[in-house]
């Protein structure tokens, strides 16, 4: 199973799961799944994690500092089809109209978006789609704070890639009973 995790899920793991993991079992399980490639962290997600809550993710999950285990996204080149998706499905056209964004400004926004962890999660998911990847995020489909590009769950739906939250991943895919890990 290829599970690609975003920064919000890493932060949720650190904030809401680790404090109850008195025995270290849960952290050890997460580390094992990361080291054997079941949990994938993109280089862009790692870089973003450095700046979230004073680097708490990297402090608590020190094993993810091994850059050899990260997926390098520099070779991910968006295809013509991806650009079409970006312009037509991933984009919130109502917001573009509402903000009066010009074509030049929209091109700049696309360029900025393509450099984000979110866009790279989608690109990488498409590149390994034959392996049925799962994207893990704590984002929801609703309310996007007037951002031009839709959130990860909505975009995953557009490209037919499974997307779930951390609790769903643990329960349904990893078959983990969290209550047994916190003792």
Residue ranges and their predicted role:
Residues 130-132, 141-183:
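Acidic, PIN/NYN-like endoribonuclease modules and their adjacent C-terminal/linker elements
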Residues 7-133, 141-142:
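Active-site-proximal, substrate-binding regions of enzyme catalytic domains
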Residues 1-3:
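Extreme N-terminal starter segment of soluble prokaryotic enzymes
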């Amino acid at each position: 199973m290829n599970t690609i995790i975003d920064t919000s899920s890493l932060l949720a793991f650190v904030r809401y799961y680790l404090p109850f993991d008195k025995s270290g079992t849960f952290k050890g399980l997460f580390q094992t799944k990361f080291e054997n490639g079941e949990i994938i962290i993109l280089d862009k997600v790692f870089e973003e994690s450095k700046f979230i809550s004073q680097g708490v993710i990297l402090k608590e999950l020190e094993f993810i500092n091994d850059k050899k285990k990260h997926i390098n996204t520099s070779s991910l080149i968006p295809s013509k089809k991806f650009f079409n998706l970006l312009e037509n499905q991933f984009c919130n056209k109502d917001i573009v109209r509402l903000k009066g964004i010009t074509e030049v400004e929209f091109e700049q926004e696309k360029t900025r978006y393509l450099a984000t962890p979110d866009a790279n999660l989608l690109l990488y998911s498409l590149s390994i789609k034959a392996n049925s990847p799962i994207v893990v995020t704590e984002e929801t489909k609703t309310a996007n704070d007037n951002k031009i590009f839709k959130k990860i769950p909505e975009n995953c739906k557009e490209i037919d890639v499974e997307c779930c939250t951390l609790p769903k991943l643990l329960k349904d895919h990893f078959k983990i009973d969290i209550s047994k890990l916190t003792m």
